[in-house]
Amino acid sequence: MNQANRLAGGQIDRSQTFKFKFDGKNFVGHPGDTLASALLANDVRLMGRSFKYHRPRGILTAGSEEPNAIVELREGARQEPNTRATTAELFDGLTAKSQNKVGSLKFDLMAINDRFSNFLTAGFYYKTFMWPAAFWEKVYEPIIRKAAGLGSISFKDDPDSYDRGFLYCDLLIIGAGPAGLAAALVAAKSGAEVILADEDFNMGGRLNSERFSLNNQSGVDWARSTVLELKSFQNVRLMPRTTILGVFDHGIYGALERVSDHLLVPQAGKPRQILWQIYTKRSLLCAGATERPIAFENNDRPGIMLAGAMRSYANRWAVTPSQSVAIFTNNDDGHKTAIDLKALGVNIAGVVDIRLDAPDSDLYEVIAGGQVVNTNGRLGLTTVTVSTPNGKTRSLACGALGVSGGWNPNIHLTSHHRGRPVWSDDIAAFCPPTDGPAGLSVAGAALGSFTTAGALSSGAKKATVALEELGFKPTKAVLPEAEGTITKMTPFWYVEGCSRAWLDQQNDVTVKDVKLSHQENFVSVEHLKRYT
């Protein structure tokens, strides 16, 4: 079968081919693919429908933060709802279905809700269904309950087994990107008992998504060689496919290891998943950062995704969402995506940079001071409308738009135990609190250090401090030379004047909804989250 959007390179095994189904149609992919990357390679952009308005949705991200491409995996008793296509490893015989639709994915009858969006704004359910009161249990409540939820379950007994267990270590390292790998090397050589956990099946973090070098070798090769070296230590336990899900008292962490989710059927005697309790003396969070979008009119069409995710699909999975791509950015990182895609033969329709002093390029057109004010394409992006500094508008024909509004450190675990994040004007994002969980330190992009050199250095330093507190004598880390260019960024959150600019694409929350909530005094983020 023809994979129209498959590029050269990548970290997939082209010597093998996996067959899989999505909504009853047959497709092919390769070992190393996720369901999302394989669908993009086969030129599938429409993968779901939004919760409230049932608007068409495509892939936005390349990781566990994905709000749109949420599907049902497998069939029969093993049917599993609400699984992110971006984290589901492809395997031979995989069957997936789209969710939250009445009819087909292309012709969802519930999309009629979008026509009544003016009546379904923030807090509408607090203001309606009030009269007559007798209608609530027999009329209103059944309708609301039927509309709620996304996927469905099989109602059959699960044939697989699930386990729980207990682990103990001196240092738990959360995240296996450059900071986590550097920290693990220091800890391994000190003789400490180390656990290195990462939610991905391929350790390396952003090194798997970039094209820069470390010590004259690719970041991918350095990550692979480092993982192999760590495997040689008896005091190191590597845990890929493992999500650290909570920080509890006395250095206890919860972790979910997906032992067999990447297989059609678990191996004999093996559980599908294991819930671990990890007891650790010290912990180091190296969970990286998540790119944030920019809100603009109709920014939710299939084909519009984060620029960093676009780079991940291109460099790691050898996939482009379209053969013609545009970029909308407020920082230099968006230009990296354009450069990488151009090097792989993808046409760059233009880079729209909100900064008047945006860097120029001989590889593609840069629209400095421009803004994306609208998009077109019902089931997939076809054009974007751009406003220029001179007050005029122009149209760019493209099948995909990469959006980059900066990066937010992944500090979720540091906010457990009532830790309060600290705002940083330097990166226009929240950074880890100083009053986080006892024994937990932070390194790398999760700390706000967005260069590879900075991540490596902070990972090694924080590990050294933690080990010395435990009485170990770590040797000085020998770190590879890596890129250390700080990305320039101008904070920019949304395009003024837009009426339907989406902030929460899964739940159909717009900028307008947030403003209305604030106007009605739902200012606290917890109140805002529930009111919208």
Language-model region placement:
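Residues forming the flavin
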Residues: 1-532
